[in-house]
């Protein structure tokens, strides 16, 4: 039986980028719903003893959709950390600045010692800022609901994937590293229809040590 993951930060720990109210609904309602649905769907089936990754790789239909959403959200919520820099700003400055440069949302302190991931990102995109710009553009350009992923293949090569609905890299034999949720429930309470502003702000709370660990596994 699957259970709702605990968040590695306080309910208001990601403010002003993600409000406590959004987190309450996104984690406590939406994700809990997927967990409850999956447990009901797999009861008494071959999937009951499988891991989320195995279910995603082998299932279809409603089971895939709910398992995929749990896997997506688990990786999404655990990739963030409170940012002292962002917390020092007011909600209006953080949420409603349409002209902010996404590069300023990257914690440059985490660049002091280049990891294999950062080296690879710079090798493929030229600069981290260029990667961030393309990643946000892919998220903005994804029609409807879904996820944008930084993913790696077996050789460690990186790519940005656009996945509708509950789909994700695991279902395609790729390794999921970093994701931004572009389902409206992830941002509408805080940003309304300004998806780009939401995605740009997320760089301020990404915990790159988590992403690097996923890449180096």
Language-model features: locations:
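Feature for soluble, non-membrane regions of globular proteins
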Residues: 1-84, 111-217
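Intrinsic disorder/low-complexity segments
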Residues: 83-116
């Amino acid at each position: 039986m699957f259970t709702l993951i605990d968040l590695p930060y306080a309910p208001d720990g990601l403010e002003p980028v993600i409000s406590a109210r959004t987190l309450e609904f996104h984690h406590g309602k939406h994700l809990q719903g997927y967990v409850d649905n999956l447990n009901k769907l797999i009861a008494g089936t071959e999937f009951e003893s499988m891991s989320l990754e195995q279910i995603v790789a082998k299932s279809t239909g409603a089971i895939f959709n709910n398992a995929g959403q749990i896997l997506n959200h688990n990786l999404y919520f655990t990739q963030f950390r409170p940012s002292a820099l962002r917390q020092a700003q007011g909600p209006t400055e953080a949420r409603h600045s349409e002209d902010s440069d996404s590069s300023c949302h990257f914690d440059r302190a985490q660049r002091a010692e280049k990891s294999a991931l950062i080296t690879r990102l710079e090798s493929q995109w030229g600069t981290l800022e260029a990667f961030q710009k393309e990643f946000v553009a892919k998220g903005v350009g994804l029609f409807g609901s879904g996820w944008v992923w930084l993913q790696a293949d077996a050789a460690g090569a990186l790519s940005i994937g656009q996945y509708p609905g509950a789909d994700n890299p695991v279902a395609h034999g790729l390794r999921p590293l970093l994701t931004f949720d572009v389902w409206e429930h992830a941002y509408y309470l805080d940003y309304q229809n300004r998806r780009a502003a939401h995605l740009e702000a997320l760089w301020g709370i990404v915990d790159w040590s988590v992403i690097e660990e996923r890449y180096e596994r």
